[in-house]
From Swiss-Prot:
Protein name per Swiss-Prot or TrEMBL: Protein pelota homolog
Annotated positions of the Phosphoserine modification: 374, 380-382
InterPro entries: eFR1_2_sf (IPR042226), eRF1_1_Pelota (IPR005140), eRF1_2 (IPR005141), eRF1_3 (IPR005142), Pelota/DOM34_N (IPR038069), Ribosomal_eL30-like_sf (IPR029064), Transl-rel_pelota (IPR004405)
GO terms (BP aspect): cell division; chromosome organization; endoderm development; inner cell mass cell proliferation; mesenchymal to epithelial transition; nonfunctional rRNA decay; nuclear-transcribed mRNA catabolic process, no-go decay; nuclear-transcribed mRNA catabolic process, non-stop decay
Length: 385
């Protein structure tokens, strides 16, 4: 993401002009735009024209509109963002108050104005415009007949390809059908890797599977690379890291990122940091339950006691339609930072973010036990009974 201009007043009202450069920038933009904001961008509008003879025709024109945002729609697989709202500035093609949907496009700038820019949104702009935040990890999670090729960016896990091939069982005295199907499966996975992984950007490609599938696949891939003189694969061989996974399903990616070998290799990535923080929370919940809580009320009480060491919070909560609720989460983040706590904002498009979402989207690891919080938890559960 490129920051073109930033005009924010002391009262935190103002506007920023940005240019999305990568597909992931659309995800960042989705987290920036909120209902009630005003968005100015170039768009296509179908307009009706009347000729001198009175015949009516229609054609599409490119124009710049400023909308008051009413609805936001994000397609995570295509990384497309559509913003619907009413026109609030005079335009020769569109009446004031008329509805329009802008589809934000890569490499076309837009200007976003807000009455209140909060700290979480401003921090996201800083991160989005930091060139170090790029998709530098890829993963192939596989089992016999099933593979997912994923890109792990700082903000999301993108499934770029799913490969499924029916592998017949080995039969006594006749393994040829099984072997042919397995070779066809491996070949399709190799093609998906070459199609979807940019070796100039990606620093590490994780190949994860149960059993010996990963070893057999990598042997096949590099034998074929030698045969066909595939320089790209051969030159990047050192980037491939083989690790264990319980299955070829996407959810196995979390356990892969928890693997100590992987964690040390990816120690500088945000995704690995999120996975470790969630893992630490679960361990604390198991061994010292007085120092691990989830749910907004419990976490707010822990914060009042200045007890929060690490706050885990889903970015989904900052997209809440209710301004008061959204502000409550922002205040919690600001307060934890002011009290020297660490804040981890999880992407809801990461596997770890999905898991945090199942724990209400907000959790905390405490510096010291707060037994009264456990008592309150017991009281509330007995009241429910």
């Amino acid at each position: 993401m490129k920051l073109v201009r930033k005009d924010i007043e002391k009262d935190n009202a103002g506007q920023v002009t940005l240019v999305p450069e990568e597909p992931e920038d659309m995800w960042h933009t989705y987290n920036l735009v909120q209902v009630g904001d005003s968005l100015r961008a170039s768009t296509i509008r179908k307009v009706q024209t009347e000729s001198s003879t009175g015949s009516v025709g229609s054609n599409r024109v490119r124009t710049t509109l400023t909308l008051c945002v009413e609805a936001i729609d994000f397609d995570s697989q295509a990384c497309q963002l559509r913003v619907k709202g009413t026109n609030i500035q005079e335009n020769e093609y569109v009446k004031m108050g008329a509805y329009h949907t802008i589809e934000l496009e890569p490499n076309r700038q837009f200007t976003l104005a807000k009455k209140q820019w909060d700290s979480v949104v401003l921090e996201r702009i800083e991160q989005a415009c930091d060139p170090a935040w790029s998709a530098d990890v890829a993963a192939v999670v596989m089992q016999e007949g099933l593979a997912h090729v994923c890109l792990v960016t700082p903000s999301m896990t993108l499934t770029r390809a799913k490969v499924e091939v029916n592998i017949p069982r080995k039969r006594k005295g006749n393994c040829s059908q099984h072997d042919r199907a397995l070779e066809r499966f491996y070949e399709q996975v190799v093609q998906a890797i070459q199609r979807h992984i940019n070796f100039e950007v990606v620093k590490c490609i994780l190949v994860a599977s149960p059993g010996f599938v990963r070893e057999q696949f990598c042997d096949y891939m590099f034998q074929q690379a030698v045969k066909t003189d595939n320089k790209v694969l051969l030159e990047n061989r050192s980037k491939f890291l083989q690790v264990h996974a319980s299955s070829g399903h996407k959810y196995s990616l979390k356990e892969v990122l928890c693997d100590p070998t992987v964690a040390s290799r990816l120690s500088d990535t945000k995704a690995a940091g999120e996975v470790k923080a969630l893992d630490d929370f679960y361990k604390m919940l198991q061994h010292e339950p007085d120092r691990a809580f989830y749910g907004l009320k419990q976490v707010e009480r822990a914060n009042e006691a200045l007890a929060i060491d690490t706050l885990l919070i889903s970015d989904e909560l900052f997209r809440h339609q209710d301004v008061a609720t959204r502000s409550r989460y922002v205040r919690l983040v600001d307060s934890v930072k002011e009290n020297a706590g660490t804040v981890r904002i999880f992407s809801s498009l990461h596997v770890s973010g999905e898991q945090l979402g199942q724990l209400t989207g907000v959790a905390a690891i405490l510096r010291f036990p707060v037994p009264e919080l456990s008592d309150q938890e017991d009281d509330s559960s007995s009241e429910e009974d």
